[in-house]
Amino acid sequence: MNLPKQLFHWFEQRQSKLCHRQLLVITGKKEWTINAAKALSCNQDIQRVLWVGDDLVEYENISIKDYRSKLGQEYDWVVLNCFSGFRANAAVALSGTIKAHGIMVILCPDLFEWPDYADPEQLNRISYGYQHKHVNSFFIQHLISSFSTNSSVAKLSADRFSGKLFFVDDNLDKERYTEQQIAVQSIRKVAQGHKNRPLVLTADRGRGKSSALGIAAAELMQSTVKTICLTAPHIRTVEQVFFHIKRLLPDELQAPIIITFIQ
C-alpha cells in the first residue's frame, strides 16, 4: 500500500532513539484506515498490539465496552477504531496501557466529516425516555480542535502526513527511576513498620504503580514478609506486578511460592 515517505522517515527516526508516547491519527475511509494501520504495524518491530473495536484475528482485540479488562497490561501499540464507536473514558484509560516509546493509533473518518458520523456508541449516551436521533458531536469537534493545536499529535491521510518527533531527555529518564525507587522504599517501609499505617500511591495511568508494587513485593519476599495479599478488579490488571516478582526473585525462592487467586 502506498503511504507518504515522510511517515516511514518519522518511524525510522523514532526507532533511532527513545521517544515519548505519541498519538497517531489516521483519517479517511474505514477500509483504508484499517489497512494503513495493519501495514504500519507489520513494518515495525512491535511485540504487542491491542486492537479496540474490531474482531481482527491477527491481533489481540476487544470491543470498546470491555476496555477495563486490559487495564494494568502493557502494549507497544493500542489501535482505537472509532468507526466501531468512540468512548472518551476508554481512550483515556487505554492510553495508560501504552509502554514507553509506544503509540496510540486512532482510526476515524476525515476530520471534517467525523462530527457528523453516526457513532454506534451514541445509543449508549442517550438518557432514558429520550428518542435516538443523530446529532452533530460537539465533543468530537473539540477533540479535532485539540488534534490541530497539539504539535505532538501525528496525522495521516491518504495523501499527507504531518508529525514531529519528541525524544526523551536523558535527565528525564534518570528522574523517572529516582521516583520509582522512592515509591519502592515507601512500600517497604510501610510493610515492615508499624501496623495500621497505610500508604497511598498515586500517579496517572501507565506511570509504573504496578511495577513499583512488584519490585517492592520481590524485595519483601526475600526478607521478612512472606505473605502478601494483592487485590484488584481483574486478575489481568496485576500482570505487571507478578512479572516483576518473577523477574527479581532468585530461582530458589520462586519454587516454593504459592500464588492463589480468590474471586
Over which residues does each language-model region extend?
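N-terminal accessory nucleic-acid engagement/regulatory domains that precede
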Residues: 69-165
